[in-house]
Amino acid sequence: MPRANEIKKGMVLNYNGKLLLVKDIDIQSPTARGAATLYKMRFSDVRTGLKVEERFKGDDIVDTVTLTRRYVDFSYVDGNEYVFMDKEDYTPYTFTKDQIEEELMFMPEGGMPDMQVLTWDGQLLALELPQTVDLEIIETAPGIKGASASARNKPATLSTGLVIQVPEYLSPGEKIRIHIEERRYMGRAD
């Protein structure tokens, strides 16, 4: 079994009789000598969908669950439900809008390549996105000529409604690459 310091976002823990999907990890370094590093983890309870927060020391042993990952394509929206189709056997996987609320901020209309669903023991757990996505800038302050030398940023609204900081020289209509986990601009899209 792994230690708490080996846990990554997207893993599932079996903790206190609950299946918890890791959504976010904050590492709190000790200020006193001899103190242990604390890992504050935010989870989503797989069965109930509730948000859970727990703290672990770096050397705490945790019980992880082995997941099955299947590549999927976005298929369609049915009211409040989003349906994804398995690329190999065309099995439909259905998520409610609340279950994948954060993922939808990065998903362009029509979906994106390399999306995966995570299942355990036949139970649908989560939708996992690739590391990067290319999105179009819909709204931002106009680009300033000669601003490429400065390192200043400005907010930009993307085609999915997500707002991130981009360099000043970018203008509406340009496609940019976003790092999903860090929510940051990486560069212009190819």
From Swiss-Prot:
Q: Which GO terms describe its biological process?
A: peptide biosynthetic process
Question: Which terms in the Gene Ontology molecular function aspect does this entry carry?
Answer: translation elongation factor activity
Give the domain of life.
Answer: Bacteria
- Gene3D superfamilies, alphabetically? 2.30.30.30, Nucleic acid-binding proteins
- Name the SUPFAM superfamilies on file: Nucleic acid-binding proteins, Translation proteins SH3-like domain
Q: List the InterPro entries hit by this protein, alphabetically.
A: Elong-fact-P_C, NA-bd_OB-fold, Rib_uL2_dom2, Transl_elong_fac_P/YeiP, Transl_elong_KOW-like, Transl_elong_p-like_YeiP, Transl_elong_P/YeiP_cen, Transl_elong_P/YeiP_CS
For this protein, the record's NCBIfam families field holds: PRK00529.1 (NF001810), PRK04542.1 (NF003392), yeiP (TIGR02178)
Q: Could you tell me which PANTHER family the record lists for this protein?
A: ELONGATION FACTOR P, TRANSLATION ELONGATION FACTOR KOW-LIKE DOMAIN-CONTAINING PROTEIN
- The protein's name: Elongation factor P-like protein
